[in-house]
Amino acid sequence: MNLFFNHTTRSADRWLTGIVLLLSFFGVLMVYDASVAIAIRDFGNQYYYAREQLKWLGIGILAMIMLSRIDYHMWHRFVLPAILGVMVLLVAVFIPGFGVRALGANRWLNFGVFILQPAEAAKLVLILYLAAWLSVKEKKRLGAFLLLTGSIFSLVMLEPDLGTAVIIAGTALVMYFLSGAPMKHFAFLLPLIIAGVVILAVSSPYRFRRLTTYVNPDSDPLGASYQIRQVLISLGSGGLTGIGIGKSRQKYEYLPEANTDSIFAIIGEETGFVGTTFITGAFAFFVWRAFWIAARANDTFGKLLASGVASWVGIQSILNMGAMSALVPLTGIPLPFISYGGSSLVILLAASGIVLNISRQQKL
């Protein structure tokens, strides 16, 4: 067991630890605030969602502490069974009685005592696998990279979950080019990516409606445009400093997904431009600090691993906040560390723990 733990006396990066805990505990507060109405409606207990989020936060913090002390090099030997295992789980969501279907998608697995969203685990596992593989593979890797990333992307798209698929693909591409891939590969991939996004957008009636509501939010105010209109009402109501914590009107079932995908809009309503700027800055700081740790890692594996986590959190937060600001189409993805959801929170905290272990072993 001692082989798994590094014995450096250097402490983990305090700045990254602080920003992760700040975002996570603020998330519990906002989950409680945003979910009061639906918690009473569905469970007769206004604290239900906050209590669940706090439970998962406790588990996540324990995972973060443990993984911050486990030598990150140990993960190198487990990446192959991990990637195969997560692909099996992504297929298992379609098994009747085991997979859970909700809101028109098969995204969850029911293990009895808890429900897991395999696509969240796939983000971290793919980062681990790519960091290990790209740190040793030097030539003829584009085809294999596209096959692996494309397989994970396709399995997530079958659920369907375009938002998570885009995060996975974007994170993988950043890691690929940070590993030293030639720019001619970028020139080859860019038109394929653009064409793929266009095809995915127009091939599904649901996604096409979301795209048209992005272009024209007034096109269907009581239907496809309803959520984005309520989001903009929330943000507009907040003004400069907000109407006050706990005073949101939109959380009373006017705004869909108020405690999950749309929680940034509740933050904007209650804390205004000042609050949303602070949260945006907090995510920017996390991304910068994780890349800072990556730049000082002792080896390529550590550099790519920390860079992958930084890219994941950066892409996901940009997509969520961009969608809530009507800068990009709605994608249905949670705000990292803040939105309600056990799988997302625990896995993000676990990933942060791995980055913290890299910081414990970084160059002075």
Question: Which positions does each model-derived feature cover?
Answer:
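N-terminal membrane topogenic signal
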Residues: 1-20
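Short, small-residue-rich loop/turn micro-motifs
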Residues: 35, 235, 239, 325
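Glycine/serine-rich anion-binding loops at beta->alpha junctions
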Residues: 112-122, 158-160, 239-244, 333-347
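Hydrophobic alpha-helical transmembrane segments of multi-pass inner membrane proteins, especially
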Residues: 17-25, 29-33, 40-227, 265-326, ...
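TM-adjacent membrane-interface loops and short helices in multi-pass inner/ER membrane proteins
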Residues: 213, 217-260, 264, 271-275
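Short linear Ser/Thr-Pro motifs
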Residues: 24, 33-36, 248, 339, ...
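A juxtamembrane structural motif centered on a specific transmembrane helix
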Residues: 1-4, 320-364
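Ser/Thr-centric signal marking residues that sit
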Residues: 164, 260, 331
